[in-house]
From Swiss-Prot:
Gene that produces this protein: dnaJ
Protein name (database record): Chaperone protein DnaJ
Renumbered zinc finger spans (CR-type): 135-213
Cofactor annotation remark: Binds 2 Zn(2+) ions per monomer.
Source taxonomy: Bacteria, Pseudomonadati, Pseudomonadota, Alphaproteobacteria, Hyphomicrobiales
Alphabetically ordered keywords of this record: Chaperone, Cytoplasm, DNA replication, Metal-binding, Repeat, Stress response, Zinc, Zinc-finger
Species this chain originates from: Bartonella quintana (strain Toulouse)
Length: 380
């Protein structure tokens, strides 16, 4: 007993053409003979999927199937006959040829004239934060494949030329019969090129290309970030038989800086201050990455972790280089170490002279803590 066509494709009877085609594509790829060589069950499912789609993709056949089921397509020689006359081998061939031609093409398949696009190349480059700030022009050397100058890219020895492939007759594809439909595959004799080289070029060994180091000038724009990718069109490996060159991708990483940390277009810098400067106030100079200095005033009583913002002193934005981020100064207060006896005595004297107004947070905290423990003792 035949399985329901909708069940075969895993769709409902109400599904539209788009869902029907999507289900067919998924199953056809899953059970394609190229992916399941020698698997008879996969071959059976593949044929079954094609048969179901052949009916359901056609509005008239689908309407007849919805009304009469499989009986609509049986040649039982009874009155009136079968208006559809069963399935023709050509129908399946057309379905799979269109489907797999669309899927396997997609810009990756070799052209019918044998032209192939060259491979893309990648290059990793490390730059300093200063170079990321101002931009630079860098010279790089990359190993790549270029067209062989001895055979001019034909792959054949001088005085000879490639021969048309006797298996595919220059098409680059061959058809293999699978029951009542045929499958188109890449020709194994010429790897889809449509030609074979019987007398290869001694320089490139028939590959049509040779390896060579090339020197390139790369423009690094100001404002690039760690992980930025630059694409140089046509600077990858050479194409074959007049095919386009691949592209070169430059992947940039920015070295950690001694003083500045970066967050987007903003820069952050930690400045240590002595306890005395933080208490009495003062000022200091700081330079941004273009060397311009700015004076930062420290008010009396500056606390650890305080932040100062210098507008427009950060990094330029990659796509709006006239706009810059900000520079944030983070204050860290340095507690004195290895005190002399005199320094220790002075600090102890300072502590005795201090009151809660000098250190409101610590005074208030310890007062509350003392009160807390006194209450606990009183309860016990």
């Amino acid at each position: 007993m035949k399985v329901d066509y909708y069940e075969i494709l895993g769709v409902t009877r109400e599904c539209d053409d788009k869902k029907l085609k999507s289900a067919f594509r998924k199953l056809a790829m899953q059970y394609h003979p190229d992916r399941n060589a020698g698997d008879k069950e996969a071959e059976r499912r593949f044929k079954e999927i094609g048969e179901a789609y052949e009916v359901l993709k056609d509005p008239q056949k689908r309407a007849a199937y919805d009304r009469f089921g499989h009986a609509a397509f049986e040649n039982n020689n009874q009155g009136g006959g079968n208006p559809f006359g069963g399935f023709a081998a050509g129908g399946f061939s057309d379905i799979f040829e269109d489907f797999f031609g669309e899927i396997m093409g997609g810009g990756h398949r070799k052209r019918s004239d044998g032209r192939e696009r060259g491979a893309d190349l990648s290059y990793n480059m490390e730059v300093t934060l200063e170079e990321a700030f101002s931009g630079k022009t860098a010279q790089i050397n990359i190993p790549s494949s270029i067209v062989c100058d001895s055979c001019e890219g034909s792959g054949a020895k001088k005085g000879s030329k490639p021969q048309i492939c006797g298996t595919c007759h220059g098409a680059g594809r061959v058809r293999a019969a699978q029951g009542f439909f045929s499958i188109e595959r890449t020709c194994h004799a010429c790897n889809g090129r449509g030609e074979v080289i019987t007398d290869p070029c001694p320089k490139c060994q028939g590959t049509r290309r040779v390896e060579k180091n090339r020197s390139l000038s790369v423009n690094i724009p100001a404002g690039i970030e760690d992980g930025t990718r630059i694409r140089l069109s046509g600077e990858g490996d050479a194409g074959i038989r007049g095919g386009p060159n691949g592209d070169l991708y430059i992947f940039l990483s920015v070295k950690p800086h001694e003083f500045f940390q970066r967050e987007g277009a903003d820069l952050h810098c930690r400045i240590p201050l002595s306890m005395v400067t933080a208490a009495l106030g003062g000022e200091f100079e700081v330079s941004d990455l273009d060397g311009i200095k700015a004076r930062v005033k420290i008010p009396e009583g500056t606390q650890n972790g305080r932040q100062f913002r210098l507008k427009g002193k950060g990094m330029p934005m990659l796509r709006r280089q006239q706009v810059r981020g900000d520079l944030y100064i983070h204050i860290t207060i340095e507690t004195p170490q290895k005190l002399t006896q005199e320094q220790r005595e002075l600090l102890q004297k300072f502590e005795k002279l201090s009151n809660h107004e000098n250190s409101p947070q610590s005074h208030g905290f310890f007062s509350r803590m003392k009160e807390f423990f006194e209450n606990i003792s009183g309860q016990n």
